[in-house]
Design a protein with these regions (language model features):
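Residues within membrane-spanning alpha-helices of integral membrane proteins
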Residues: 13-20, 62, 92-96, 119-122, ...
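Aromatic-anchored segments of alpha-helical transmembrane domains
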Residues: 23-26, 94-103
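Juxtamembrane helix-break-helix junctions at the cytosolic face
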Residues: 70-89, 93
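Membrane-water interface at the C-terminal end of transmembrane alpha helices
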Residues: 124-139
Length: 139
């Protein structure tokens, strides 16, 4: 089965590897471009100390995301089919709940939440991961 066919069939192994790679790239980007991410979230009219804290926060967020990507890839490679599907389903649900809570919490702070074009892709990707796991759990 080709990679495209595996993706179309929502093979949990393929989906988990893709999600892991996306998470790794996102974490690396956030870490490398922490200054840009901090400015987009907190604005440019903040003190030097606040800017340093905001950039550090963004770097930590990037570092936090990278192991999640590695965990997703590792689970895709080492678990058997049934457990991989279960992991895809439940890890997707947990991350979806986390992101919902995260974005709701961020609205209560001075942090400028990302615009809708940055919010939809993670939710869509996690939805695909959850559905992939659900579809293959019973097989």
């Amino acid at each position: 089965m080709s990679l495209v066919e595996k993706f179309k069939s929502l093979d949990p192994k393929t989906i988990m590897i893709v999600v892991g790679i996306i998470a790794m790239i996102g974490g690396i980007d956030t870490n490398i471009n922490s200054e840009t991410w901090a400015e987009s979230a907190w604005g440019t009219e903040i003190s030097a100390e606040s800017k340093n804290i905001a950039e550090t926060y963004e770097k930590i967020w990037g570092v936090f995301i990278m192991p999640l990507g590695m965990l997703c890839i590792t689970a895709a490679l080492v678990l058997d089919d049934k457990n991989r599907a279960v992991m895809a389903f439940y890890s997707g649900c947990v991350m979806l709940a986390f992101f919902i809570g995260f974005f709701l919490f961020m609205r209560t702070t001075d942090y400028t939440s990302p615009s809708i074009e940055f919010i939809i892709p993670p939710f869509a990707i996690l939805g695909i991961l959850i559905f992939s796991g659900y579809k293959h759990m019973q097989q």
